[in-house]
Amino acid sequence: MVSLVATVAYLGLEARAVEVQCQVAPGMPGFHLVGLPDKAVGESRQRVNAALTSMGLALPPKRITINLSPADLPKEGSHYDLPIALSLLSAMGVVDAEQLADFVAVGELALDGRVIPSPGVLLAALHASETEKGLICPAAQGSEASWVSGGSNGVPVLAAPDLVSLLNHLKGTQVLRPPEPGRADPVPRGPDLRQVKGQETAKRALEIAAAGSHNLLMAGPPGAGKSLLASCLPGILPELTAAEALEVSIVASVAGTLEDGRISRARPYRAPHHSASIAALTGGGLKVRPGEISMAHLGVLFLDELPEFQRAVLDSLRQPLETGEVTVARANAHVTFPARVQNQMHVCKILTHLSYGIFYDHYHRKNGDLLWTILDQRAVQRLFLRTSENAGT
């Protein structure tokens, strides 16, 4: 008999369906995991074994085979621990397979059986909702999952603190309380543009850039107030709508930076250092993660000392500014992240992915031809600050 449990694989901001298949058959005792697992997934054998031992369960002295299907899709991350454990428990007859058929399971297991958070739960909840299934996830991320899978659509969310509580709930001896969607964080108060004295021309340009979602080039001598004005931009942008907040939170969830499942209505503000690499700015790495331009989705990306960025890094901005997407190509996958610059006030055609103004600071002749090529991709407000306007700041 083969037991089946549904889970997901993350490819950028896309969740692919994965089926965890478990077979317990006579033969030489062993625990075999196949289906292109990475090192983190391969180590789940030890975590699952230790978690079951903490529950007082022992693996049967048989040949255990776990297959992550489809086998040609790379599997990365520790969120496979929980579905692997549930599939194994189903094959051992501890839990009824029919009770797991309508759920997607994600979560990492601690050695004592606790279900601990893993990145991407919000994306898994979206996938579960689209496939009309419930979601089994860590208790610490239940409020995060409830933004999508709970509430009016009736899709259940089982937020389990540990494996024992989850099994007791499935057996009917314990009831896991449905999690409530986490309250949206209040918009934090940053620098107030009204408190900046002088620089009326600069402040007017800032307002125009915010209203029209224009890129803005700020050039001037040190101490002119360019960085201060740039930090004031999020304060004059409107709050994120519920749909926009969900989009921003999905990116944060995949990156593992969403705190306590709380959806934020504040516009993201990212200010990478000029030594940032291409992978840091556009996304990449061994396990592809969103870069700074995607983390600024629907928000502000402030590039201070722009000419000090490496030429190759600046060149990597051309396509995102033109197409509104960042595609990271790897040998085993092509991952696309959002990087759209678009007016939230509907001046232009509304697209799915938006990002408010990109700031360029301290422009000069270094890499000039390349910089102007980048800037000409979109309407740009070019502002030259004069120190004479700084009196009283």
Where are these regions (language model features)?
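Peripheral, non-AAA+ core regions of ATP-driven protein-machinery
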Residues: 1-228, 310, 322, 327-330
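P-loop NTPase nucleotide-binding/switch module
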Residues: 174-208, 212, 243-294
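Walker A/P-loop
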Residues: 218-257
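The Walker A (P-loop) glycine that initiates the GxxxxGKT/S ATP-binding motif of P-loop NTPases
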Residues: 220, 283, 305
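AAA+/SF3 P-loop NTPase mechanochemical coupling elements
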Residues: 269-272, 289-298, 329-346
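Substrate-gripping "pore-loop 1 plus following alpha2 helix"
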Residues: 287, 315-337, 355, 365
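Conserved AAA+/SF3 P-loop NTPase catalytic/coupling segment centered on the Walker-B
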Residues: 290-321
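N-terminal low-complexity segments that are often proline-rich with Ser/Thr-Pro
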Residues: 345-393
